[in-house]
Amino acid sequence: MAHAGKTRAVPPRAIIYSTGDRESPEAYEQFQDSMRGGFLPWSGKKIGDAKFRIRIEAIHVDDGFIGRVDTVDTLSVRTKSDISASSGEYVYASFNLFGTMTFEQNDEVNVSKPGDLVIFDSGRPARVSNQAARGRTCSGAIALMIPKSSFPHMDAEASFANVRIPRERLLTPLSNSLNLLTNRMPTAAGLELAAIYD
């Protein structure tokens, strides 16, 4: 299901949000309205003078999401108001493809380079900034949203509050799965993505 400038307040089966080649000065505000009105709201702002462009492709898998995000330099903020307006609690896992991502949560700051994985908590305030790689106009990441209920025997709040795993420390099976997601995300069918997600 494609959404032109808006998302629903419940988890949809699929989300495609793209500014395309639009150069409208309202493009960022339209995107922000979508993010604030979603089932897991975020706030934020654009950084710099570049025209705002973003593309999000995501699919609902089991009770979570797998997606790819390509964006110009932005700052995304998860406020207490955003958290209270959310319809669920998730663990985020962000696999950096290119560019630099800075995560601030739980009094920690983690800078993610390509190949790094950062895990953070939807139930705590957070700030995430994206900076394009040299020679590119965007940064890119594979993002997973996993319900906290998937970890019944773990203290999710203690275990997933802003943890960076550098690429050289990723376990081989996990690294292979993330790289497969990177390569297959644009064309894979839902069942195939679900198998990788599991």
Regions found by a protein language model. Name each.
Residues I56-E57, S81-S84, E108, A132:
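Short, flexible, glycine/charge-rich loop motifs used to bind or transfer phosphoryl groups or to couple energy/partner
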Residues D33-M35, R53-S76:
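A short glycine-rich, His/Asp/Glu-containing loop-to-beta-strand
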Residues Y28, G48-F52, I59-D62, S86:
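Generic structural signal for well-ordered secondary structure
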Residues E57, F65-G67, V91, C138-I142:
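Short beta-strand micro-motifs in enzyme catalytic cores
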Residues A2-K51, T100-D198:
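Alpha-helical bundle regulatory/interaction domains
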Residues D62-G64, T71-S76, S81-F103, D116-L117:
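Glycine- and acidic-residue-biased ligand/ion/polar-headgroup-sensing regions
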